[in-house]
Structure formats: C-alpha cells, structure tokens
Amino acid sequence: VHKLRIVRSFRRRGEIVTMTGDGVNDAPAVKEADVGVAMGVTGTDVTKQAADVILMDDNLATLVNAVEQGRCVYANIRKFVRYLLSCNIGEVLTMFLGLLMGMPVVLLPVQILLVNLVTDGLPAVALGMEPPEKDIMSRPPRRSDEGFFSGGLMGRIVFRGILIGLSTLGSFGTVMRMGGSVEACRTAALITLVVSQLIHVFECRSEKRSLFRLNPFGNMKLVGAAALSAAVLAAAVMVPQLQVVFSTVTPDMMQLLTALGFSVAVPVICGVI
C-alpha cells in the first residue's frame, strides 16, 4: 500500500516513476508505475506478470546501468537529429538565398548529392554511437511533459543552420569577387559546406560543453567517419576523373584558404556566443 501511494504521489507531480518489487503485495505498485521492475530470481509470478521489466540477476546495480544506457540513447538521438537538421537547414538556405541574391546556382544537384552522402551518412551514424558523458547520471531526470526539442534545442539547430548557409554563400561570393570562375566558386562553396558540417558533428557531441572543451578522440568511430568523409571531399576536388563527375576544379591557395576560413569561422562564432 505504501509503495502504491508513493508511485501515485510522484506521478501526480509529473514525475516518471520506476518501482521494484518481488512479493505479491508489490504487484499493484509495480503495475501502477511507469516502469515496473520485478525480481527475476526471488520475484513471484504475479509480480513478474505485472512488471514491464524483469531483473534477471536481482542486482539493482543492473537497473542503474540500464538507466544510464537509456539516458545515453535518448541524448544520442537528440544529437543525431540536431546534426542532421542543422545541416539540412544550411543546405536549403544556401540554395534559396543564392537564388534570391541573383547568384548563379551555388551547388549543382550532383554536388548536393555528394554533400548528403559525405556528411549525412557515416558521421551521423557514428555520432549516434557516442559513449555516455561522464555527468549523465548526475543530471536531473526529464519531466514527463518535456518535449523532444526542449532546452533551446530547436533554436540552436536553426541558428547553426543559418550560419552554415551564410558561410557557404560567403565563400562562394568571396571567390567570385576574387575573379574565380563559377566552377571555382562552387568548389569553394562545396568545401566550406562539407568542412563546416564535419566540424559541426563534433560540436553535437555534447549539449553542455563547447567543442573546445571536448576530447576530440572521445569517439574514435566519429573521428574515423569524419576522416573518411574529408578524404572523399578531397578526392572529389583533386582527382581529375572525379572533377568531371562533380563539376569541381582544383582550388588555388587563396581559394582554399577562403573556403577553410569560412568553415572555421562558424564554430568560432558559436563558441564565443
């Protein structure tokens, strides 16, 4: 009875409640909880039937580990969505604003396809494998009425997407003012877009700490995916056969520095803000 009162009291306050139990008298509270946990070794059949989860080893430390993994999975989903939406907003904004400003087509369809394959594939998947952050269990639990984009997540997504789009357009326009051909401008824009997104994937590793405070080698799968994506970009820009396919040209030193400069400017601005 006391367990049942505890469960109902916390649920009235909007909390998500987990209740453990093993005896027949625990079954109502286990059933009432958001997540009912029964003991697999000492638990009665009635309690097991009422439970959502059966703890096979009766070790409550296993329950703590499960909560940690659950928090990690939820956090990684938010990171994954944050990264992909920011990148897509940046790509759409690049094309849309370029047309409004009367520029030539900033990126060709085959180049956009390359961007999606390079930045939306392996890095995004590797980001979803990010290990739990050290302080993940010290954070307060989420409320049951808390939305997925809570904590200003949507604002950060839109803001970062806008910066990616503006930096790509800035790279395109700067190379154009330097007298570069349309192909050179597109190549610079392609480099800026891909590199800025590859930098952003490392920013998405944490919602609490900036890129400059994270261990860059904390997720080696992500490092490998980013390196492979960068290699694909370099091949598309430097290999003559691929230049024909992706309509790129080898940038000169000033064009390359311009493209990389606009790529680096975005995380610096975000880090300062």
What are these regions (language model features)?
Residues 189-208, 225-236, 265-270:
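Hydrophobic alpha-helical segments of multi-pass membrane transport proteins
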Residues 29-31, 48-49:
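Structural signature of FAD isoalloxazine-binding scaffolds in flavoprotein oxidoreductases
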Residues 105, 119, 236-237, 263-264:
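Hydrophobic alpha-helical transmembrane segments of integral membrane proteins
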Residues 1-19, 38-209:
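Membrane-embedded transport module
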Residues 153, 208-230:
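C-terminal membrane-solvent junction of multi-pass transporters and transport-like membrane proteins
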Residues 146, 182, 215-218, 248-249:
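Helix-boundary and loop/linker segments of multi-pass membrane transporters
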Residues 1-25, 31-35, 77, 99-102, ...:
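Cytosolic catalytic headpiece
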